[in-house]
Amino acid sequence: MDHDNDKKRLHEDSDNSEIKKHKPLDVLSEDGPLTQKDVVYFKKEAIWRQMRSYKQKCTLLTRDLNDIKSNYESNERKINVLDSWYESIINLFGVKKESNVELNETILIQLTNVPIGDLDALLEKRRAQLLTILSPIIENSKLSNIDKSDVLEKIEVLNAEVATLKSENNTLSKLKSQFESKVEDLQAQLLTLVKDNDRRSSKTLQRIDESLTNGSDVKEEASETVKSEVNKDTTVKNENSVDNEEFERISSEIEELKSDNRLLKESMNQINTNYDKVVKENLQLSDKLENLNENDLINSVSYQELAAHNKQLNESVNNLQKINDTTVNKLNELENKQTNVKHLLDKELREENETLKQQLQKSENDLVRIRTARDELLSKQTILKADFENQTTNDELNKLNKVLNERINALESERHETGDNSKISELSKDELIQRINMLNSEIKEIEQAFQETRENSLSKLMSVTDQENMVKKLTIEKTKADQKYFASMRLKDSLSSENKILKTQINKSQELVSKLNDLEKSYLDKIEILTKSNNDFKIIRQSALQENSKLQESLRAIDVRKASLEKELSGMKDKYSDKVQENTSFTQELNEKNLMMGKLEHKLKSTESLLKKYKTNNTSSILQEDERQLEALRSIAKCSVCSKNWKDTAITVCGHVFCSGCTQERLAARLRRCPTCNKGFSANDLLSIHL
């Protein structure tokens, strides 16, 4: 339906474009009563002012939105750069997950939001990678010999910094909220000032104000013209009216004189009665001042107030003294408790420190012993490896020796089998001798080689047996060393578990220390508050004593003043006669003024009676003009449909203004057309205004 209406509007605008170009602008009338065109002009200008205020709000919102967008874009660029840096760091270090390494989850902050999207998944991945890199580095960089005093000092410094930062944060948040509220107030004031400026510069409002002021002027001018016309008519019609006016004037003067006489008599009677009262009161006061008693002083209001104030001050001083004594006792008790707690904590910390140092020394000694045993075992292992290699070479030599012996035996058997006596007999004696010598030399060489090989084999066998014995001994020592190693590892595990327990105890003790530090700070704050209150009480006591002394001095001054007043009384009696004379002069002046007032009142009554006469003759035309102007103003401000409610909703399609109730009723009844021009509108075309 709204889409069809928009189409109709576009069609109508396109058809009537040429007519709108030649259509003259609306003009506000400058004088005379307000017309219907002036009312329409007034409505349009009100809508224009409201649209300008909406535009200003929109510009402010767009400016804020642009600032937020620029901040968002800069933050997104920074996040992308930081992500690339972290990715390059992770790639440089290389992420390799190890099963033995425990991730320290307290290093990096976890994500707080529950729904995990793409960005949250990426951040979780980066966090896991950084934890795998940082946790082993932090574990390796932890020192075993940590000084507790340094740790406690650092904790105290950090706690102090945290407290200061919290206080600064609270103050800054309060300042921020105050500045935000001030900025909102200033924006609202600026908008109201802009609206007021628009209303001041609007022609229609100036025209209405002029019409309202001109209405009163018109009434006065009309009354004056009526008077002049009446006078003219009376002079033309009847010349005897002058005599009537003179008669009325004389009668009014006589009445004025009578009223003046009556006022003079009343004022004289009042003056006489007042004079008698004043004389009596003066005599009574003089008698009282001459004969002042203690009862009069006690019954005096100032004396009672001073006495009550003195009592209150004494009671407050006593109460403050009691409170001071109780606070001093509490302070002493708190100081004693604080010293006892400090001594206990120092004792416990020293004992725990000594036990930890002893356990650490034991573990270091055991570690040195285990390392020496390990080094010995490694050296023996290298020796055994070398001996094992020598044994393999000996086995190979023995195999070679066996092969050579077998070869010699085979050659000898062949020699015996192939040796023919016929050949030997064929040889000569010299050849036989040479051959025998050669054989003897060969036999000697063979025997020598055999002996050498035999000695080598025997020495090798001896060394092998020695090595086997050594291996057996070393295996026994190795088993012993393994047992010692396993025992030391068990001891190491127990020490590591004890170390963890001690670490947890140290953490608990540190938490207790931090809690005790907080308690100490709170106690110190309380002590400071109590000392301040004690000082305040002392100051109050001193001030009370000073006030008491001042009151005593004031009482003495009152006694002195009493004597001086008695002296002044005689002087006052002398002055009384002067005052009586002044009183008579004042009474005369007052009587004269009363006479003047009576005359003026009588003139006012006479003028009012004349005005009533003139108003009864010619006031119908003025009243009709006033009614017309009032109806015009009502038509501007009241709804033309129901004529009950004020106009507060404008239809932006045609510019007509009605009340919100009538527009909503028409929308609910699906009568979506303007009652005056019959143009279609929707709920989006309504605009709330303030006339």
Curated annotation (Swiss-Prot):
UniProt KW keywords: Chromatin regulator, Coiled coil, Metal-binding, Nucleus, Transferase, Ubl conjugation pathway, Zinc, Zinc-finger
Reactions catalysed: S-ubiquitinyl-[E2 ubiquitin-conjugating enzyme]-L-cysteine + [acceptor protein]-L-lysine = [E2 ubiquitin-conjugating enzyme]-L-cysteine + N(6)-ubiquitinyl-[acceptor protein]-L-lysine
Gene Ontology terms, MF aspect: ubiquitin protein ligase activity; zinc ion binding
Metabolic or biological pathway, per its Swiss-Prot or TrEMBL entry: Protein modification; protein ubiquitination
Domain of life assignment: Eukaryota
EC id: 2.3.2.27
Gene Ontology BP annotations: chromatin organization; protein ubiquitination
Region span, Disordered: 1-24, 211-231
Compositionally biased spans, kind Basic and acidic residues: 1-19, 217-231
Zn finger spans (RING-type): 639-678
Coiled-coil regions, chain positions: 49-83, 147-459, 491-620
Primary location class: nucleus
GO CC, one annotated term: HULC complex
Keyword Zinc-finger: yes
SMART domains: RING
Protein role: E3 ubiquitin-protein ligase that mediates monoubiquitination of histone H2B to form H2BK123ub1. H2BK123ub1 gives a specific tag for epigenetic transcriptional activation and is also a prerequisite for H3K4me and H3K79me formation.
Family, as annotated: Belongs to the BRE1 family.
Name of the protein: E3 ubiquitin-protein ligase BRE1
Organism: Debaryomyces hansenii (strain ATCC 36239 / CBS 767 / BCRC 21394 / JCM 1990 / NBRC 0083 / IGC 2968) (Yeast)
Gene name of this polypeptide: BRE1
